[in-house]
Each structure stands twice: as structure tokens, then as C-alpha cells.
Amino acid sequence: LDKPVLIEGPPGVGKTELAKSVANMLALNCIRLQCYEGLDESKAIYEWKYGKQLLYTQVLKETLGEILEGAKGLTESVAKLHEFGDVFFSEDFLEPRPLLKALKEEAGCVLLIDEIDKSDHEFESLLLEMLSDYQLSIPEIGTIKANPDRKPLVFLTSNNTREISDALKRRCLHLYIPFPDADLESQIVKARVPEVPEELRRQLVTFIQALRELDLKKVPAISETIDWAKTLILLHTESLDSELVKQTLNVILKFQEDIEAVTGEVQMLTNKATKAP
């Protein structure tokens, strides 16, 4: 459909990894723009190489006599200098940022605009031309367009911390990724940490799934499940027990208030995980 993909879902479900995996699968360069409050065109699109412009201006100043030699009157002098003014605002003096880099990739690329919900609404407006026409307009130069045969594959991710504008959503296909169910999460752990015994894998996934049902400040993401699996392997764990779980809660819970809230439930959750079929 030749459209960007907006991927939404809770933090840690693999939205960013999806874009990276597409780049790896297609053997394309992945250009990433990490969004944040206050992000503007100088960090996302382009800025001028002011140091280089200043250096060339100094060189021009030192050779001014040679340049203006033979000029008759002010009009001819201005005309000669005008040619150099245009040079200073050419692509040679342009420092491309992620969005412009993606357009200039002749072989195509994957452009990952990560956590768009952390940026301002004003930045969303800057993206609209890029998302709809795969081009960017620079006042001093003109419009720079992507190779029509190898346009960048654009992925935007959002953790839904704020509402994305309708204008941006209209330009994108939408994909929502929820937390995986137990079967899928078990497959993910098996793929990422294959040395985990099957029974331990079932227990830790069951425990994590139960944790996500609790009222926590931040529930464990898939990355925390994988980190916990690696930790349990390092501790030579064969089966979960409540004391071991308490000692390793800091691997899967990132806030002390969550650790304190869960500590009293560990025995019950561990029993549920170890006795589940």
C-alpha cells in the first residue's frame, strides 16, 4: 500500500524490535529517530554546517579582490557575490538528520520513528509531508524526494502516552501489539533463551502473566521476562521457589513500590506457577 505503519501498544511488547527485524530480514540499513519533547527540524531533518560556512566566508573575504576584479560598478559586484551566496546554501553545506538521511538512501532503508507520542504536536506537523509524499521541503534548496523505486519503509511506534493527531494517523496503516499470551511468550523465551528447561520456562511465564494482572505502576514487559530467564539460568535454577523469586524481583519490577506490593503475594503466585498444568 506504500504507506508508513504506526505501531501502538504498551511498552516492551516488541514494537521497536519489529522494525529492526524487518530491516534485518530485508538487509536494509535501519535509520532510527528517537523522539522526545522539544524535538525539532534541526535534530530530525537537517541543519546547516555553520562552521564550514564561516570558513568559506573567511576564504571569500581574503580573495574578495580577485573575485571582484573587472567588475564595473556596484551592480556587477553584487552579481558576482550573489553566485557565492547560493553556494553557501547548497547541499554541500547541509548536515542531514535521520529523516533526510532516509530520503537520500538510494538503496532504500527502514526508517524507525520511535516513541512518536513523546514528541510535540508541532513535530507531528513536520512529519506530514514526509509520511504522505516521501519528500521534504527545505526553503533554501527546494524539495528533496526519495528514490521512487526504493522509498524508505517507515515505522512509527507509540506507547499511547498521548493521543496521536488524526492527520498523522490518516497517513499511516495501524497495527496494535498487545502483551503476548502464555503460549506465545513461552515461544519467545524459548527462542531467546533456549537453555531454559521447559518446566522452568512454563513456570516463569505463568508467574509473569499473573503479575500483569496486578495493579502495578509498570507491569513486566517481554524484555523483563527474557532478563529473568537469563538470571535464573545463571543461578542454576531448576524450579521456582518463593525465596528465589523475592531475591530476583528487581529484575522484573522496576519500581520499589511495585516490589513491595508484590512481595506479599509471592508465595501465592509461586504456588500458582509451580502447580499449574
Language-model features: where?
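C-terminal regulatory/interaction module of P-loop NTP-utilizing enzymes
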Residues: 1-277
